[in-house]
Amino acid sequence: MRLLSRIKYFLFLSLFLFSSCEEELESEALVFAEDVIFVSGEILRITGRVVSSGTVTITDHGFQISESPEFSSPIIISLGERSIPGRFIGSYGELSTGTDFFVRAFLITKGETSVSEAIEFSTLDPELIDYAPVFEEAGQTITINGKNLTVDSEVFFGSQRATITEFNNEAEIKVRAPNPAVGEYSVSVRVITDGKENVFDKNFEYIIGKWQLDSNYPGDPGFSRNVYFQHEGKLYSGMEDAGTAVQLFWTYDISTKTWQKKDFNGPYVVYPGVYNGGFLGGTDTNSIVKNFWTLDQSGNFIAEADVPFRLVQSVSFKVGDDLYVFGGQNEFGANNNSIRKYNFVSKEWIVLGTMPIVTSSRFPSFNLGNQMYFLTVSNDLWKYDANTSQWEQMASYPGATGAIGGGTIGDFGYVGLGNNSREMFEYDFVLDSWKRKTIIPGFNNDLTLGWFTTDDEIFVLRKPSRGTGASKLYKFEPFNF
């Protein structure tokens, strides 16, 4: 059909070239559909041509588009009046994707409509290429790349519809990630175009975690160092140093959200090794002490026999009836690399070996039973298996250096709030991988002076780095939104 149309066009043109130019009568005109020069999911661009030996009065010309060759109820591309022969271009941008169409040129002269032979074409189906980022907070911009995407496309994150903020050239859609439905934190990303649904292979994952202010801390607002630990559902913070040593603790009852003063009948100490239920070692600012403190079920401090070593800033884990003590510094200021274990039943200490790393309470640590994890100054993560006495290097921590604290909830470890950072990270024990969580309120340079972990929540004590603003206790729920 296209070949026959072109033959007619050239024959008609040849007739005009060899015809007499002496007459001034208005010429006859023919119209041809030439080439489909562009087609996508919803856009068609096509050229046509009016052929005439002279001027001609055309009241309208353009193209007709239809899904049927009979052109019943066609889409009209009207290009208006015309008086001279030549090429013309038409465009239409609201076609259905993945559909077969017919297009033909037309002109109207002397009240009569002439049409060309039809050209058949097909619009393209929408395709998805990728999207980024694949891990982000709700409300942030997500960019979707594809082909033949239409302006009326809809984007869904799981069951939630996203708001489209920008559409570019059928190839890019920018959306705001919607708030997730309850429990839907790893969701498919679907793009619906003309009723056709395309789904990305990789799920989108929300950065989740809920921070909220739980209480204001009643201690001295000017303190810069303290001793903190937890015991039987209560949080302990004390031994504050704000220029003058404070020889007491504040206890926080999580269930009632109340603080109470707790007298301490021992000497003032800083930088001890702390664990869930007490602390040991440290310094009284003049020398390293060998004190060892536990708490009974009523929360009273009990002085155990002195430890057989002198350490500050050691790392301690209580697992069952055993207390493991790692690293720290000795009385000469040198890094200690010993691993010790104390049994609360036999009251005996033993040395288990040495560590291949340098660690202290200045660096984050956490444990999953007898498997203990340590971050180094360079953010390397090491695991110690107390059952086998083996060390293994794991996935490096991706956050800022200088992070503190550390805790375990379920199958995940938590570390964060490094130097000038409000980021919290979650470590997956099974996958050996890190994932960012929601940032804590406040300022990047706020100081973290306490970290406590319960069965399903983390409590963090934060204070401004400058001035004497009150410290605040924040609660973090890692699986909430």
Segment roles from a protein language model:
Residues 1-30:
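Bacterial Sec-dependent N-terminal signal peptides
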Residues 21-134, 138-147, 152, 160, ...:
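Short, surface-exposed linear motifs at loops/turns and structural transition points
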Residues 37, 48, 129-145, 154-155, ...:
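An edge-strand/N-cap motif at the start of beta-rich repeat modules
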Residues 48, 63, 214-241, 249-251, ...:
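Conserved short beta-strand element of beta-propeller blades
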Residues 92-93, 98, 144, 164-165, ...:
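Hydrophobic core positions of the immunoglobulin-like beta-sandwich fold
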Residues 245-247, 257, 288-290, 335-337, ...:
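Repetitive beta-architecture junctions, highlighting loop-to-beta-strand starts
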Residues 252-257, 295-299, 342-347, 385-389, ...:
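Short loop/turn segments that connect beta-strands within beta-propeller blades
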